[in-house]
Amino acid sequence: MTRVLATGTFDLLHPGHVFFLRQARSFGDELYVLVARDSMIKHKAQPIVPEGQRLKMISAFGVVDKALLGSESDIFEPLKEINPDIIVLGHDQFFDTGELEKNLGERGFKAKVVRIDDAMKCELCSSGRIIKRVLERYGQNEE
């Protein structure tokens, strides 16, 4: 049984997220998903949707066997419970695959790291594009 782990913020769910999770699932038999904690997101703007709500939405996907919130202190902590065989990164995730595999090995994990370079091509397959569209349509100062 091959256990796959996918991670992400999953803010403003869109078809690109669905594509990523389906691709991740194709690497194994079980798909676990770590949803980033609001407090750990430092490389981009804070999510619009709170972490608990994002977790519930990801948990509802049929391709996902189990979704969990990430750790608020150590990104490797949840891996002790999950013990993945493969960690799948999306095309836009900032981790370096080689560096991540090295860090995993130093912590006793044997997971292989793969990146899905394909991205679904559609007009609103990006949380950033969705936000831009909302701002264009409704203006920045309106509620």
UniProtKB/Swiss-Prot annotation:
Q: Name one GO biological process term.
A: FMN metabolic process
Q: What domain of life does the UniProt record list for this protein's source? A: Archaea
Q: What is this protein called?
A: FAD synthase
Function of the protein: Catalyzes the transfer of the AMP portion of ATP to flavin mononucleotide (FMN) to produce flavin adenine dinucleotide (FAD) coenzyme.
Q: Name one Pfam family in it.
A: CTP_transf_like
Residues that bind ATP, according to the entry?
T9, F10, H14, P15, G16, H17, D92
Q: Name one GO molecular function term.
A: FMN adenylyltransferase activity
Reaction(s) catalysed (UniProt annotation): FMN + ATP + H(+) = FAD + diphosphate
- Database matches in InterPro entries: Archaeal_FAD_synthase, Cyt_trans-like, FAD_synth_RibL, Rossmann-like_a/b/a_fold
Q: Which residues form the signal peptide?
A: none
Q: Which gene encodes it?
A: ribL
Looking at the keywords, is Nucleotidyltransferase present? yes
Establish whether keyword Nucleotide-binding is in the entry: yes
Q: Which cofactors, by name?
A: a divalent metal cation
Per UniProt, the keywords (alphabetical) are:
ATP-binding, FAD, Flavoprotein, FMN, Nucleotide-binding, Nucleotidyltransferase, Transferase
The UniProt entry's sequence similarity note says: Belongs to the archaeal FAD synthase family.
Instruction: Name its species.
Output: Methanococcoides burtonii (strain DSM 6242 / NBRC 107633 / OCM 468 / ACE-M)
Subunit-level organization = Homodimer.
EC number(s) per UniProt?
A: 2.7.7.2
| Pathway assigned in UniProt | Cofactor biosynthesis; FAD biosynthesis; FAD from FMN: step 1/1
Q: Which PANTHER family match?
A: FAD SYNTHASE (PTHR43793:SF1)
